[in-house]
Amino acid sequence: MPIRVLDELPAVNFLREENVFVMTTSRASGQEIRPLKVLILNLMPKKIETENQFLRLLSNSPLQVDIQLLRIDARESRNTPAEHLNNFYCNFDDICDQNFDGLIVTGAPLGLVEFNDVAYWPQIRQVLEWAKDHVTSTLFVCWAVQAALNILYGIPKQTRTDKLSGVYEHHILHPHALLTRGFDDSFLAPHSRYADFPAALIRDYTDLEILAETEEGDAYLFASKDKRIAFVTGHPEYDAHTLAGEYFRDVEAGLNPEVPYNYFPKNDPQNIPRATWRSHGNLLFTNWLNYYVYQITPYDLRHMNPTLD
């Protein structure tokens, strides 16, 4: 699915160099089809890096995807130029009267911060409540999963004593589920979180269906039966080098981090890591776009009435 973005967005050239199909707005205007409108609420500090990661995963299917980037934190960014934010991001007030086919809420490095201490917690609540009536399907990633479980289901924050960092094996629980269609029986995916997601907690306190778990019994992928919300507790969007960057950052900060599990060859941080989860990440996002967004979203977005099974 070629992603449709503004011609000047830095990700255009970056992804084209990787042979990723990116369609600029000027080119897309010549195709007589309705693109899927996908809103990305980017909560990560390094916004350009995160844009590249998610746009890469949204790009590999025959339909157009019209991407809109959203920010809700008005504070000055230390990691992203103000010019970039002003040129390519909208504020919630700019889009609150619109409807979208899909919404992705990214992770955020807030695993040890209490919800009420998050500077934009009221805005997070506002967006999630708004999405119920304005978005066909929402995908939450890592910290956003924890935030959504609290806001939508009242589940208190669950925190691990140590950070889960590395590339872990998972297994699917429902081979015929649409979101896991085409998955291998077991697959690898990266995690980088303090948040804890025991599968028993999800089963006991929500009506969500767990579709894949870690080998340790943590919920990795789960969703509502009506496909309106989906959750992934890891980071399938990560580049090969992302965990390494986080590890060396923490080393320089004197935090004495554990070496990410099953990541560096021979467990040696001097060795260059490889991405062993790329096919999984691409298939997950393609399935979400197809089965959770495209197949149920209304053609006319002015009338938000998803087609439910």
Swiss-Prot record:
Q: Which CDD domains match?
A: GATase1_HTS
Provide the protein's localization.
Answer: Cytoplasm
State which pathway it belongs to.
Amino-acid biosynthesis; L-methionine biosynthesis via de novo pathway; O-succinyl-L-homoserine from L-homoserine: step 1/1
Q: Which organism is it from?
A: Salmonella typhimurium (strain LT2 / SGSC1412 / ATCC 700720)
What main location does UniProt list? cytoplasm
Q: Which residues form the active site?
A: C142 (acyl-thioester intermediate), H235 (proton acceptor), E237
* Site positions per UniProt: Important for substrate specificity: S192
* GO cellular component, as recorded: cytoplasm
Family assignment from sequence similarity = Belongs to the MetA family.
Q: Which reaction does it catalyse?
A: L-homoserine + succinyl-CoA = O-succinyl-L-homoserine + CoA
Q: How does it assemble?
A: Homodimer.
Protein task:
Transfers a succinyl group from succinyl-CoA to L-homoserine, forming succinyl-L-homoserine.
Q: Which GO terms describe its biological process?
A: L-methionine biosynthetic process from homoserine via O-succinyl-L-homoserine and cystathionine
What one GO molecular function would you report for this record? homoserine O-succinyltransferase activity
Encoding gene (name): metAS
Q: InterPro entries, from UniProt?
A: Class_I_gatase-like (IPR029062), HST_MetA (IPR005697), MetA_family (IPR033752)
Enzyme Commission number: 2.3.1.46
Per its record, how is this protein called by name? Homoserine O-succinyltransferase
